Amino acid sequence: MNKSRAPPDARIQKMRELEERLANLKADRKVEQKMVAVAEFEARTTKKIVGNLVQQRYDALKARAEADLNARRQRLADKLDAEDLAMRQELLASKKTPEQRRAELAERARALAATREAERQALASTLYEKAFIQSCDVLRDENSKRILYRTIEERNAQIEHKMAQRIMEAEEKRMWHEMSEVERQKMEQRYLDDKRRDREKREEVLRILDEQVRQVNARRAEASMLRRAEIAELNATWRQMAADQEAADVQERENMKKLAAELQEFNRIKQMEISEAERSERELDLKILQEALSKEAADEAAELAFRERRREEMRRYREQLALMMEKEREETAERDALILKAQLEQEAKRDAELAARDEARRQLMAQVDAIRQIQIQEKLAKRLERAEEKAFERAQMAEEVAKAESDAAAKDAADRKAGIQRRLELQTMMVAKAHMKAAELDEKLAEGEATKRVEDQFKAKVNQTLSSTDPPVWHGRRKFDW
């Protein structure tokens, strides 16, 4: 029976253990507060150090800028002094004799004259070349074609660049949406992880509280068993003592009664002590449970506030994103409209210029055709006039021959001799005319060869100009003075 009884100071030891546990919790809380204070102090110190470093860097850059400015000023001052010294030396060395100055002036005048003549020749060549380029219809046609081809190529290049730019913008938007989706998934995963960790923490706290409640209940059950065992032992002792003292004398019975009264008083006091300890334990358990419940409620309120704040931030973020996308869409549409309008205006202007050029070219060709028709009519008139002259000469020759024959039949030998002489003169004239016709034919052949040679030179010049020059960016209308 004595072996199963708990030591008298068991409850005191348990109270001391509980007090030590509470003291340890308070010490841990103080250590945690101290660590938080140290972390805040380190953060403030780091911020101050960074600010000092930035200020030092700013001061160093400012000092270096001032040093560079002073160095540049010194270099400029040295350069000015050197130029001043060189100018003084040049002024001192420029003192020459009148003969030297006259010779230098003459040499300079000859050099300027040669330079001016070279510039005049170059300007004349340039102006001749420019006049040839502007007055050559073949070059104008080729340049018009080259400008048209270049315009088409540039327009195609701009269209391709615009399409590539739109494709790149679409790809950037797609990548941006993908990145936004990835970030959103990461945020949701972090939120779920935080929720899981909070749930695990709450479960751990509940498990610890359940373990503490179980231990408290076990301690209560053990204390109750000890009390019941002690009461049963005391009752058994009392009954044994009462049974042993029944046969004693009255004094012993009185003593036993006094002892029983003292024992009852002891039991009452003991019972009061046990009730006070139970009440303290229950109040402590209730206090611990209330603190745990209040902490859990505070955590849930903080979590709800955090979720509401994150939801508000996501809503504002989506609204800002929608506004940015709408603004970008409006700017893109407006820019495309301006580009299309400018392109249409440019095409209309180019079409008007091409129509004006075609009209000017058509008028020029009409004028050239009219001039050629006039020249052809003049040549035909000259040929008809020459044919009439030849016919008149042949008729005159026939008349003269008939007259000579009639005169030859009527006249004597002297007249025949004169007729023969005139015939010889006529033959000489005919031979001379034949020679003149041959010379005219040779002259026409020479003119044709010269014309062909000039045309070949003209074609070579055109080809050389086309290969050595670029088409003009703007080819305006010329005024022709025929």
From Swiss-Prot:
Subcellular location: Cell projection, Cilium, Flagellum
Superkingdom per UniProt: Eukaryota
Keyword Calcium tagged: no
Segments forming a coiled coil: 9-40, 67-124, 152-413
Alphabetical UniProt keywords: Cell projection, Cilium, Coiled coil, Flagellum
Region span, Disordered: 462-482
One Gene Ontology cellular component annotation held by this UniProt entry: motile cilium
InterPro entries, sorted: CFAP53/TCHP, TPH_dom
A GO BP annotation: cilium movement
Protein family according to the UniProt entry: Belongs to the CFAP53 family.
Main function: May play a role in filopodium movement.
Protein name: Cilia- and flagella-associated protein 53
Lineage of source species: Eukaryota, Viridiplantae, Chlorophyta, core chlorophytes, Chlorophyceae
